[in-house]
Curated annotation (Swiss-Prot):
The gene is argP. Homodimer. Gene3D superfamilies: 3.40.190.290, Winged helix-like DNA-binding domain superfamily/Winged helix DNA-binding domain. It comes from Escherichia fergusonii (strain ATCC 35469 / DSM 13698 / CCUG 18766 / IAM 14443 / JCM 21226 / LMG 7866 / NBRC 102419 / NCTC 12128 / CDC 0568-73). One of its GO terms (molecular function) is DNA binding. The lineage of its organism: Bacteria, Pseudomonadati, Pseudomonadota, Gammaproteobacteria, Enterobacterales. PANTHER family: HTH-TYPE TRANSCRIPTIONAL REGULATOR ARGP, TRANSCRIPTIONAL REGULATOR. This is HTH-type transcriptional regulator ArgP. Controls the transcription of genes involved in arginine and lysine metabolism.
Amino acid sequence: MKRPDYRTLQALDAVIRERGFERAAQKLCITQSAVSQRIKQLENMFGQPLLVRTVPPRPTEQGQKLLALLRQVELLEEEWLGDEQTGSTPLLLSLAVNADSLATWLLPALAPVLADSPIRLNLQVEDETRTQERLRRGEVVGAVSIQPQALPSCLVDKLGALDYLFVSSKPFAEKYFPNGVTRAALLKAPVVAFDHLDDMHQAFLQQNFDLPPGSVPCHIVNSSEAFVQLARQGTTCCMIPHLQIEKELASGELINLTPGLLQRRMLYWHRFAPESRMMRKVTDALLEYGHKVLRQD
């Protein structure tokens, strides 16, 4: 059985995390040549490339499996060392999360764990349709995703759903929808997406108004909080989680443009198996809080 030296795995991990050999060498306090030698040693052991040497480098499928193994080992080390970790460097916990969860329920859910445990969070923000891929690639140890199926050697639990409403300010609605929200009016009303792969508003408009993707003017803004600001200031109409704008809806600062219509996204919590003690704490915290504030029906 091939048993990699974890020093060599850490070199592979550093090249991916630091997006290059030079910064990886600085991170590990060794020469760039030494980093290359360690990765070459790993590749010789497995008889295949573990890195695609692009800019930035990315792991091959086998490289992804090895990085996932490293993540599990790091967490299990924490499990076995237990109280001996007290006073040492806090455990790094890398999680892939969607921006809307981060802007609404995720941080309150993690608050008890952060207050009670010596960990350093590394939250990698990605669309909920793509967070699971970060877990597959071994970049993180847990992911909030819309995918219900667990990856091999992983666990999954349902968190609950975010309900998205199509909203705007009242002045925006009066300007663009004086006769109500119609297909013709929507063609002129600007919307906003998180990135070029965010299809939330496109799916909603196509399903309910038969508007094909790309038919409405669209801003690109990588911030959930900015969606709320853009809607409040009358710049756009957009899809925002109801949980994020309860106060604005109650005060009338924002209005639901399409009462009775919404877009529901069920969220799931994925992580490696077996779980370490620390990951079990994270899982319990996310499930307990998620089941309180997210839709369960």
